[in-house]
């Protein structure tokens, strides 16, 4: 057994991506300066507390193309979103943002669902097609499923087939359908304004066209814990509409702004550097960038349409202990630091 376990850091000293290349370059220079032996154990130990190695370029951009919702989950009240009245992100602005992302990160996952229902925009297919025009980018759509139709799914499938091959071994289009329940009764108590039958049907529609790329999602809270086993048992079967794919997501209290409703504490015994500060960037409809997903209604780190992606990203500083330089008090209340997106 190794004396120390670095697996939680997911260190990768290869140069197969921009995010790893920059980490390796920074590690090499710093190790030379500090006279660190060029051995895996020594380099891992050294890299563990180096912000310039742990945080290089974003791997996941979660973009708010729509500030509207189709339904509202019981565990994320709409008032927390603080984007009421904001206009949707226009397609031309979105495409300009993608160009910056592709240049800065080279390879990344682009989410379309930050604080809003992406299917509320006109022609979601055009947004997805724009992402897929960059070989290094793939797209994630998280939806409540109520607006998914056969026609829309067919159009997106055509866009996928016409897109250039991906530069990385990652699904070009991934779908998450928020269900949060196994029964219609429980669903109705969890999601206000939703439609259980339509959401389940969305998994079927998408699963037939995007096999192994559709994930029904269950956000685990005290109120639906009694249906977790049935949800898992059904959707985990390979003959289910999702082909056995599913996500059980932890509840987020938004740094204790919301009540603690999680049935179990899954946080590690020792705190690790925050994955979201290291790898994620959220961009709202107006181009403003929250410091992290937990910063709701606070002063943004910057605006990508005014300052550029790289400039704003560099403002989000990571300390040597893996927390935010400017928001240490908030980080101390947060238990999302160990959850990993891409």
Enumerate the language-model features and the residues they cover.
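Hydrophobic helical membrane-anchoring modules
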Residues: 14, 20-56
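Conserved core of the sugar-phosphate nucleotidyltransferase
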Residues: 1-14, 22
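Canonical Radical SAM [4Fe-4S] cluster-binding loop centered on the CxxxCxxC motif
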Residues: 60-93, 104, 292-296
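Radical SAM/AdoMet-radical enzyme domain recognition
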Residues: 91-113, 121-235, 242-246
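Short, acidic, Ser/Thr-enriched surface-loop or helix-capping motifs
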Residues: 283-284
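A short acidic, helix-capping loop that chelates divalent metal ions and anchors anionic groups
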Residues: 7-9, 82-84, 183-190, 257-258
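C-terminal accessory region of radical SAM enzymes
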Residues: 36-52, 202, 209-213, 237-265, ...
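Short, small/polar residue-rich loop motifs at catalytic or cofactor-binding pockets
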Residues: 274-278
């Amino acid at each position: 057994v190794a004396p120390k376990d670095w697996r939680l850091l997911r260190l990768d000293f290869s140069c197969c991506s921009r995010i790893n290349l920059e980490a390796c370059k920074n590690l090499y220079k710093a190790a030379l300066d500090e006279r660190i032996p060029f051995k895996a154990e020594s380099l891992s130990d050294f890299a563990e507390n180096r912000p310039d190695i742990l945080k290089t370029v974003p791997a996941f951009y979660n973009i708010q193309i729509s500030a509207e919702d189709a339904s509202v989950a019981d565990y994320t009240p709409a008032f927390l979103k603080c984007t009421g009245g904001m206009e949707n992100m226009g397609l031309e602005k979105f495409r300009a943002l993608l160009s910056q992302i592709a240049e800065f990160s080279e390879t990344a996952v682009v989410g379309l669902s930050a604080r809003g229902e992406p299917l509320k925009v006109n022609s979601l297919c055009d947004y997805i097609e724009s992402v897929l025009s960059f070989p290094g980018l793939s797209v994630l759509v998280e939806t409540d499923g109520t607006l998914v139709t056969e026609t829309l799914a067919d159009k997106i499938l055509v866009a996928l087939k016409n897109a250039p091959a991906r530069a990385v071994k990652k699904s070009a289009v991934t779908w998450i359908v928020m269900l949060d329940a196994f029964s219609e009764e429980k669903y109705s108590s969890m999601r206000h304004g939703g439609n259980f039958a339509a959401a389940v049907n969305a998994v079927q529609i998408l699963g037939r066209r995007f096999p192994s790329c559709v994930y029904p999602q269950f956000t685990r809270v005290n109120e639906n814990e009694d249906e977790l086993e049935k949800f898992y048992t059904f959707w985990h079967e390979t003959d289910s509409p999702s082909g056995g794919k599913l996500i059980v997501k932890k509840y987020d209290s938004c740094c204790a702004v919301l009540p603690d409703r999680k049935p179990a504490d899954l946080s590690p015994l020792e705190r690790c550097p925050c994955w979201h500060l290291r790898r994620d960037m959220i961009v709202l409809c107006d181009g403003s960038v929250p410091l992290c997903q937990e910063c709701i209604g606070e002063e943004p780190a910057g605006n990508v349409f005014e300052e550029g992606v790289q400039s704003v990203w560099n403002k989000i500083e990571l300390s040597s202990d893996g927390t935010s330089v400017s928001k240490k008090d908030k980080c101390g209340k947060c238990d999302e630091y160990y959850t990993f997106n891409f």
